[in-house]
Regions:
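Short beta-strand/loop segment at the start of cytosolic alpha/beta domains
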Residues: 1-14
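Amphipathic alpha-helical interaction surfaces in cytosolic regulatory modules
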Residues: 15-86
């Protein structure tokens, strides 16, 4: 495993802290964590690397109202480009 997902309850809901590297092989676990109806934000400050599939999953969840906190600039740019091309 090259990543870690920690869950932190807040008064607004659950915040997921993702650290390490997320790849296609990790998507099922990440998707399951994001499907928890109480997730309000994903903390990305410790995220080192993601692939395109993981970026798309984060973009979809952001579009559905989940906040991406401290999103690394390269991921933010990637999400923006992906949305603009759709």
């Amino acid at each position: 495993m090259t990543y870690r997902i920690d869950r932190f309850p807040t008064s607004q809901g659950l915040v997921l802290n993702i650290s390490g590297r997320i790849t296609r092989e990790d998507l099922d676990i990440l998707r399951t964590a994001l499907e928890d109806g109480s997730v309000v934000a994903v903390e990305l400050a410790e995220l080192e690397l993601i692939d395109r599939d993981a970026m798309k999953l984060l973009a979809i969840n952001e579009a559905n109202g989940i906040e991406l906190k401290h999103c690394p600039p390269y991921i933010r740019e990637w999400i923006t480009r992906e949305r603009d091309s759709s």
